[in-house]
Amino acid sequence: KPVEREELISRIESNLTYSRLAHRHNVSRNVNDNTENSPAYVKAILPRCDNEKDRKFIVKFLDIIESNYQDERFNRSRASELLAMSDRQLNRTLSKLLPDNFTMFLKKYRLEKSMPMLEQGLQITQIAFEVGFGSGAYYSRCFKQVYKVLPSEYEFSQPVETE
């Protein structure tokens, strides 16, 4: 899908800045560093992984989510296939590392990704399709479930709170 030029430049500059700092201070990257441009929801729930295996899993998992969240057909089965693990193993691993199951994580991730578009005043249906929801009505229901208000009524001066 097309990307806004300013957003792409901003992300590249941010990544370059971090790379320079990490190199200068000889800092190894952890999960939180890899999610610098992630939605607030992701930053809020990500644990500091105690071991390298969990850290690598989270980084790979987030890369897969970022690459596929806009596809409305993307689901746990497809994610587990891309991670080369069974659905059950993915469920066990996620329950160990995250407070939400896969479906809720993906839903909240998509909702967070929709916030800038909502703030710009784009139409609900357009936003819904852009972030992987099947319809504007379903997007609105999910938004209300998580934020306790419809997207059309959301005030951007408030801090974002999820359940």
Predicted segments, located by residue:
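Basic, amphipathic alpha-helical hairpins
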Residues: 49, 62-74, 94, 98, ...
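Terminal helix-turn-helix DNA-binding modules in bacterial transcription factors
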Residues: 96-134, 156-163
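Short helix/strand-capping hinge loops at secondary-structure junctions
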Residues: 1-2, 19, 68-73, 101-102, ...
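CheY-like receiver
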Residues: 19-60
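Basic/polar phosphate-binding segments, predominantly the helix-turn-helix DNA-binding elements
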Residues: 76-105, 130-153
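C-terminal output helix
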Residues: 3-12, 16, 24
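C-terminal end segment of the histidine kinase catalytic
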Residues: 20-26, 139, 161-163
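Heptad-repeat coiled-coil signal-transmission/dimerization helices
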Residues: 8, 12, 58, 65, ...
